Amino acid sequence: MKTKKIKWKAGLIVLLPVLVLIAILIHGAVRSSETAKKTSMRIGVLLYRGDDTFISTLRASLEECAKEYEKENGIKVTLDILDAKGNQNTQNSQAERLISLGCDVLCVNIVDRSVASIIIDKAETADIPLVFFNREPVEEDLNRWEKIYYVGADAKKSAVLQGQILVDAYNRNPESLDRNGDGLVSYVMLEGESSHQDSLIRTEWSVQTLKDGGVPLKKLTGGIANWERSQAAALMDQWLKGYSGEIELVLCNNDDMALGAIDSIERNGILPGSIKVVGIDGTPAGKEALRNGKLFGTVECIREDYAREIFDLAEGLIMGTLNNHEKYYWCPQSALVN
C-alpha cells in the first residue's frame, strides 16, 4: 500500500511541471491568437488647444506615425483627435464620447493638470489605458492606476539648456549680453500659464542657471503671456516703452512667446539681435527665426521622437506587447544656437 502511495506521489511530482508548462503554452497561444486577430486599433487623442503651435506640430507627427504603422503592418489605425479649446469641462465630455466610441486607448493633453482624476476615473471604469502627454498631471493621479503613463520633456532640463546657451555666450564675450556695459544683464521674462508646472520650472531654472554660471543679472519685469505669440508681443510693446533702451535679454518659456517678443522688437524699429531673445521648443517657426538671426537660441525636443513615443506606448498597450515600461518617458532635448 505504501509503495502505491509513493508511486502515486512520484507520478504527481513528475506530472505537475508538465501540466504547468501546458497551461503556460495554452495561455500564450490564446494571447498570441488574440493579438493576431487584431486587424485595427482606435486611438483617442484629446488636445488642450489645437491652435497651440507645439501641439499642432505634435499632432501632425502623430498622424504620420499612424500612417507609417498602417503601411508597415497592414493594421488600420483610426485616430480620433478632439480639441478642447482650453476648456476642461469640454475635454471631460470629449473623453466620455471617445470611450463610448470604443477607443482602445486615450492619449490626453490635459487642460487642467489638477483635475486629471475625472478622466482617469472614466477611463479606469471602462478599462481603457491612458497616455498623458505634454501637460503632466500631479504625481498622485498618475500613480492611481497601473495603466497610466506620461510622455513629456523634462522642464528643468529645458531651462538649464536655455540658461547654458546664455552662460556660454557671456563667457565668450560679456558685451554680447551686457550691451550697455554697466556690469549687469538687464532682462525681462515671458512666462506661460501661471499654474503650468513647465512654466514655473522653466522660469526658475533658466534664471538659476544664469546665476550659477556667473552671469550678473538685473530683472526689469516679467509677465504671463499664456504661451501665445500675440500676448507676448503686447507685453513686449509695453516693456519697450516703460524700459526704453534698458532691455538686453528676453527669456521666454517657449518659442511662440519668443517670436512675439521679436515681432514687438521689429515693430518698434529696434535692430534684430540687439536684444537677445531665447525660447524653448524648437518649433519650425522658431528654428526659422534662429536661422534668420532674429532668435538667439532655443531648446529642441524633437517632435517626431516625442510623437513616436506616444504612438508606440499606445500601440503596445493595445497589442499587449508593452513590457516593464517606465511610467514616465522624458524626450531627449538639445540646445540650438544662432
Kindly give the residue locations of the regions a language model identified.
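Short, low-complexity disordered leader/linker segments with a strong preference
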Residues: 1-42, 121-126
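Hinge/cleft segment of the Venus flytrap/periplasmic-binding protein
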Residues: 9, 13-14, 24-29, 183-194, ...
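Extracytoplasmic "Venus flytrap"
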Residues: 44-65, 69, 80-92, 101-103, ...
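Short, solvent-exposed amphipathic alpha-helices that sit
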Residues: 54-70, 158-162, 197-216, 231, ...
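Short beta-strand elements in bilobed, periplasmic/extracellular small-molecule ligand-binding domains
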Residues: 68-84, 186-189, 211-229
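Hydrophobic alpha-helical segments within soluble ligand-binding/sensing domains
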Residues: 91, 150-182, 232, 283-286, ...
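Hydrophobic alpha-helical
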Residues: 96, 108-125, 130, 206, ...
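Flexible loop/hinge segments that line or gate small-molecule binding clefts
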Residues: 119-157, 178, 182-183, 283-291, ...
